[in-house]
Regions:
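C-terminal functional module detector
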Residues: 105-111, 115-232
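Domain-core and long-helix interface of multi-subunit machines
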Residues: 5-134, 149-150, 215-227
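Conserved beta strand-loop-helix elements of the APE1-like EEP
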Residues: 1-3
Length: 232
């Protein structure tokens, strides 16, 4: 939602991010620990400049990077390309560790996912082969937003609601390939108000963390890298 040409400014990333923030836009570090896939001549495109500050968030789960990570030989490449449900395992461990590291330093950083879909259609004789179909990628992994009010159909108003929730991190990453995550809720309640992810509130008079999970699952509440409690 930046609305400006940015590639020519890549030599001064901090200046670019500062300008993004001035315009109330969003800066997300994509596939920060991406690995290459030499068999397909796919280069490694990780994020390496961790000196920058004040970016909005980083991707902790990217399906395109996950394909490369889980494809170690030609047989796995073919299998994963033909059966897209076979390769997504979960969020990138290195990205989770980096996110946790930043949070433990008191740096507010949001977590995002990316379908990073690259549907390809190939013809093999009379056959038409579709790999990485959009329908699969856009349903397997999603950023779910907590918007403060129902979308109205007014484009400008709804865009502001959506972008604002993305900007402050009022959202969660849902690995919907495993099970639908719609209906998951995580919020803090206290002082006659609720605070959703990305929001702040005083804990002076006590706060209750509430979690609603749409299906039976294992739930871990983690703080500063430590599991405070686990439910099954």
């Amino acid at each position: 939602n930046y609305g400006k040409e940015a590639s020519s400014r890549s030599s001064d990333l901090q200046n670019l991010i500062d300008d993004v923030n001035k315009t109330q836009s969003i800066s997300i570090l994509a596939h920060p620990f991406d690995q290459g896939l030499s068999l397909l001549r796919e280069p490694s495109i990780p994020w390496t400049n961790w000196e920058i500050k004040n970016f909005t968030g980083l991707e902790i789960f990217n399906l395109s990077s996950e394909f490369k990570t889980q494809s170690h030989n030609i047989f796995q490449i073919v299998k994963n390309a033909l059966d897209q449900k076979s390769f997504p395992v979960g969020p990138d461990e290195n990205s989770i560790v980096k996110w946790d590291e930043l949070l433990c330093k008191g740096i507010a950083v949001n977590a995002y996912s990316a379908s990073d879909a690259h549907q390809k259609v190939r013809r093999i004789g009379p056959f038409r082969l579709i790999t990485f179909p959009y329908a699969f990628h856009f349903s397997a992994l999603n950023n779910h937003l907590y918007v403060p009010e129902k979308l109205s159909g007014n484009l400008l108003k709804d865009k502001e609601l959506i972008y604002n929730s993305l900007r402050i991190g009022r959202s969660f990453v849902g690995f919907d390939l495993v099970a639908p995550t719609t209906g998951f809720r995580f919020f803090a309640e206290g002082e006659n108000r609720k605070a959703w992810p990305g929001e702040r509130m005083s804990i002076r008079n006590g706060v209750t963390i509430k979690i609603d999970i749409p299906q039976e699952s294992i739930c871990r509440l983690i703080h500063n890298g430590n599991v405070l409690r686990q439910w099954e």
